[in-house]
From Swiss-Prot:
Record protein name field: Growth-regulating factor 4
Biased composition (Low complexity): 228-245, 285-296
Biased segments, Polar residues type: 297-320
Membrane-spanning residues: none
Subcellular location: Nucleus
Keyword NADP: no
Family membership noted in the UniProt record: Belongs to the GRF family.
Organism: Arabidopsis thaliana
Function noted in UniProt: Transcription activator that plays a role in the regulation of cell expansion in leaf and cotyledons tissues. Component of a network formed by miR396, the GRFs and their interacting factors (GIFs) acting in the regulation of meristem function, at least partially through the control of cell proliferation.
Annotated domain remarks: The QLQ domain and WRC domain may be involved in protein-protein interaction and DNA-binding, respectively.
Cysteine disulfide links: none
Length: 380
């Protein structure tokens, strides 16, 4: 037992001496590097701070050339109980790099080279080589700490189908995809469909409205002042949108001049319908509601003075169409616009047509002049 203990002690002493000599060699290497850096630098930067002094109590005093092998070995023996030689070497190197960082100086490449070599010798699970390391050395980074492989073509669009295909376009600046795939995964909305709805409305002034009404009732020379004293309000003519309504309106416009100039002497229209509702008394109270003018009938309001009294007679010219007559009963604004004798009754022109025939028939008991007791000489 004593022999084995003596052999074990001698072996431990030999190992400690060998480790002490190796530590001395490493310390001399670092000291030479620091001395070269301080000698080549023009200004006395913080590098002299790392030069160990004999009186310094730092942990690097054991690496100074003035220190003996016994002191370095004794210091390492004190710390060797906690760290192995490789761990101690790495700890001293990291402490030196940390001092460079505290001083704000650039860390020399020689101090980083051992770390890089140690990382390269480790397992590939902890470090992955850059793909451009061999083909493009100028693109080779110092090291890569990522978990996945680097992109072999960083300027190429990353749009893939999950297999082998990949987009061949260049990426947009500041993005991962090209201009075609930059909106990948973004919701797209349809453009709103614009439907243009046009409504055609025509407005006529008083002159235009009186001209249209003059065309409907007659074109003779005696009808020049028939609607001369109409109201100054414009008439709003609604445009027919359907084709059937337009055709109906055109047919009515084509036959109105003939109906106005025919005189209605036989009491029948061109279609063979018997004219009825020739006289229609409207109430004196007029509504203020406006409605579009019909094309077949007209409402006339006449005020005739006589026997110090005035009476209003409303006349309606009918063509025998029941629908048009029903529609004309709703046109209350027309009798206000067509009141040409409301200002005094000074227009006594010779009128033709069914209106003149009704006024001239003195023998008829249902005549307006017979009921009012007015002589027919006033209108001749």
């Amino acid at each position: 037992m004593d022999l084995q203990l003596k052999q074990w002690r001698s072996q431990q002493q030999n190992e400690s001496e060998e480790q002490g000599s190796a530590a001395t060699k490493i310390s001399n290497f670092f000291f030479d590097q620091i001395q070269s850096q301080t000698a080549t630098s023009a200004a006395a930067a913080p590098l002299p701070l790392f030069v160990p002094e004999p009186t310094s109590s730092s942990s690097f005093s054991c690496f100074s050339p003035d220190s003996s092998n016994s002191s370095s070995s004794s210091r390492f023996l004190k710390m060797g109980n906690f760290f192995s030689w490789a761990q101690w070497q790495e700890l001293e190197l990291q402490a030196l790099i940390y001092r460079y960082m505290l001083a704000g100086a650039s860390v020399p490449q020689e101090l980083l080279l051992p770390i890089k070599k140690s990382l390269l010798h480790q397992s590939p699970m902890h470090f992955l080589h850059h793909p451009l390391q061999h083909s493009f050395p100028h693109h080779q980074p110092s090291w890569y700490w990522g978990r996945g492989a680097m992109d072999p073509e960083p300027g190429r669009c990353k749009r893939t189908d999950g297999k082998k295909w990949r987009c061949s376009r260049d990426v947009v600046a500041g993005h991962k995809y090209c201009d075609r795939h930059i909106h990948r995964g973004r919701n797209r909305s349809r453009k709103p469909v614009e439907t243009a709805t046009t409504t055609i409305t025509t407005t006529a002034t008083t002159t235009a409205s009186s001209f249209v009404l003059g065309e409907e009732l007659g074109h003779g020379p005696n009808n020049n002042h028939f609607f001369s004293s109409g109201s100054s309000q414009p008439l709003h003519l609604s445009h027919q949108q359907s084709c059937s309504s337009e055709m109906k309106q055109e047919s009515n416009n084509n036959k109105r001049p003939y109906e106005a100039n025919s005189g209605f002497s036989n009491g029948r229209s061109d279609d063979g319908h018997i004219l009825r509702h020739f006289f229609d008394d409207w109430p004196r109270s007029s509504d203020s509601t406006s409605s579009p003018m019909s094309s077949s009938t007209c409402h006339l309001s006449i005020s005739m003075p006589g026997n110090n009294t005035s009476s209003d007679v409303s006349l309606k010219l009918s063509t025998g169409n029941e629908e048009e007559e029903e529609n004309m009963r709703n046109n209350n604004n027309e009798r206000e616009q067509m009141n040409w004798w409301s200002n005094g009754g000074n227009h006594h022109n010779n009128m033709g047509g069914p209106l003149a025939e009704a006024l001239r028939s003195a023998s008829s008991t249902s005549s307006v002049l017979h009921q009012m007791g007015i002589s027919t000489q006033v209108f001749h």
